[in-house]
């Protein structure tokens, strides 16, 4: 068994070097300042520990208008990525920015998976950024895997 902890990702109440794996599934990775939560992940991970996190893909972020689902056309400039305001503050760094953020905190990128929907995908009730038609053509989410030395 392992403990599941619900806490502020910018101030995790765990001791240094206490975890082998840190996961964020659209939590800290979207709604917290990336430099702050990635620093916390680096602090609590043991040497060789892995950080796995999901974010909206860069392409879906560029194709989402201020309100409504992703469109087939770009809705904002690439330069607008980073700290963004939708219903609240969200963070959507570019791939290059993620690599820099991870590197600043001692991580190397092991993998980046740009996820698309499968042929039998259906639209979930809770996810309105991109429908399954859009997500079957372009990546709706990015899954990052990073590791400490």
State what each model feature region is.
Residues 21-35:
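A short SAM/SAH-binding and catalytic strip from SAM-dependent methyltransferases
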């Amino acid at each position: 068994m392992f403990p599941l902890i619900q806490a502020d990702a910018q101030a995790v109440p765990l001791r240094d070097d206490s975890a082998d794996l840190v996961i964020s599934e659209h939590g800290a990775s979207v709604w917290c300042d990336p430099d702050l939560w990635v620093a916390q992940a680096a602090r609590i991970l043991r040497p060789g520990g892995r950080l796995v996190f999901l974010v909206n893909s860069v392409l879906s972020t560029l194709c989402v208008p201020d309100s409504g689902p992703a469109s087939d056309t770009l809705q904002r400039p690439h330069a607008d990525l980073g700290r963004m305001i939708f219903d609240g503050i969200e963070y959507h760094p570019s791939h290059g920015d993620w690599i820099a953020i991870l590197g600043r905190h001692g991580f190397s990128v092991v993998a980046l998976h740009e996820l698309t929907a499968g042929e039998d995908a259906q639209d979930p009730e809770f996810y309105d950024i991109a429908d399954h038609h859009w997500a079957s053509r372009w990546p709706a989410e990015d899954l990052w895997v990073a590791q400490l030395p």
